[in-house]
């Protein structure tokens, strides 16, 4: 069974992704595209303080190759 994902805002997630080597590439409206030096990329919707849905958060983790553990550390 997978661990329950914590409630995370886009701002918090962006800080975590940047700590793991992701950089902003471009922004289209409220969607920020980030890319890692090894080619992994993902899109994060940035909406004023709202928490990201669990399904979206799970997909972003899958896109980036990170685990749910990085969200709690």
Task: List PLM regions with ranges.
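Basic nucleic-acid-binding interfaces
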Residues: 1-73
């Amino acid at each position: 069974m997978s661990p329950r994902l914590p409630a995370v805002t886009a701002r918090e997630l962006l800080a975590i992704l940047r700590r793991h080597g992701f950089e902003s590439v471009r922004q289209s409206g409220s969607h920020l595209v980030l890319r890692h030096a090894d080619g992994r990329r993902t899109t994060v919707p940035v909406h004023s303080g709202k928490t990201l849905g669990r399904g979206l958060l799970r997909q972003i983790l899958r896109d980036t190759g990170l685990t749910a553990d990085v969200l709690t550390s």
